[in-house]
A protein has these predicted regions:
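Pseudouridine synthase
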Residues: 76-84, 196-255
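Short Pro/Gly-enriched beta-strand edge/turn motifs at strand-loop
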Residues: 33, 171, 183-184, 233-239
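Beta-rich strand-turn-strand
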Residues: 209, 269-270
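RNA pseudouridine synthases
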Residues: 1-166, 180-186, 194, 262, ...
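Short aromatic-glycine motifs in intrinsically disordered, low-complexity regions
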Residues: 168-180, 243-244
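Long C-terminal interaction/binding lobes of large macromolecular proteins
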Residues: 189
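Short polybasic amphipathic segments
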Residues: 161, 254-257
Length: 281
């Protein structure tokens, strides 16, 4: 039964052992940390390198490659989060005892096939401050993408987005429909490079909705190369055949903080392959 909590009164809470362990972190299975230790040996041996673009005592930023999950979708997955944990174990910054009380974690998410900047909190302070900055939008996020079409001027888009959970796709409308739950979106872009009927944009993600950039640009006739949900099938087939592009050319390239600091991550080789093809059209 719902009951209002009153200030100054004492309350007793009763949990099962399992629930208490989950809340306290003391119930972390040894096997989970051991699995991360095994993964960490790939870093200590030099077999694997984490693409770190910035790191201090509280936070770490990596350049996530295309195809890597940001977080686990299934228990057996190895995501960017696990690689960061293993990296910190290899450095001696994360021990089994500290793992039981606090787990470093990513602060933002990217789709599996979107590359670029992922931020993670190494400490509780780092995690809280980064999460707050992202939530309050005091850090500005910029992306790079290559789209179909010739665009020579910057533009600002407003609209409304609705997600269809069954298809994992979103719909975009310029004006808010009278029925259904539609979220306001804002997207700003400017052309960086234009050639052969294709344009590379820097996109300022002003509202961070699911699939926002991909669907918003497609809605104005400029779908991203390699986007199999919202893109041009003929364009996608051409670039898959000629440039080995198998997913959307969308990359989280730059974070800009209120104090003027910037953290950047270079685009992957797939961008260069796409431009090599475009230059020879």
């Amino acid at each position: 039964r719902n009951r209002k909590i009153e200030s100054g009164r004492r309350y007793k809470l009763f949990f099962s052992n399992e629930t208490f362990e989950k809340f306290s972190g003391s119930g972390t299975p040894d096997s989970e940390f051991e699995a991360l230790k095994v993964l960490s040996r790939e870093f200590t041996s030099g077999k694997r390198k984490l693409p770190v673009v910035y790191e201090d005592k509280d936070v770490i930023f990596i350049n996530k490659p295309t195809g890597m999950l940001s977080q686990k979708a299934k228990p057996e997955d190895i995501s960017a989060n696990e690689y960061i944990l293993a990296y910190l174990i290899a450095k001696g910054e994360l021990t089994e005892s500290s793992f039981r009380t606090f787990r470093p974690s990513i602060c933002n998410r990217l789709d599996r096939n979107t590359s670029g900047l992922l931020a993670a909190g190494k400490t509780l302070k780092g995690l809280q401050e980064m999460a707050k900055a992202l939530k309050e939008r005091s850090v500005q996020k910029y992306y790079r993408c290559i789209v179909k079409g010739t665009v020579k001027e910057a533009s600002y888009l407003k609209g409304y987005l609705q997600k269809d959970e069954s298809s994992n796709q979103v719909l975009i409308r310029r004006t808010k429909p009278s029925e259904g739950e539609w979220l306001p979106i804002e997207t700003e872009y400017k052309p960086i490079r234009c050639m052969g009927g294709y344009t590379e944009f820097e996109v300022h993600l002003m509202t961070g909705r699911s699939h926002q950039i991909r669907a918003h640009l497609a809605s104005i006739g400029h779908p991203i190369i390699g986007d199999y949900k919202y893109g041009d099938s003929g364009v996608n087939v051409y670039f898959k055949r000629n440039a080995r592009i198998t997913s959307q050319l969308l990359h989280a390239s730059r974070f800009v903080f209120e104090d003027g600091r910037e953290i950047t991550a270079p685009c992957g080789a797939e961008f260069e392959r796409a431009w090599n093809v475009i230059e020879n059209l």
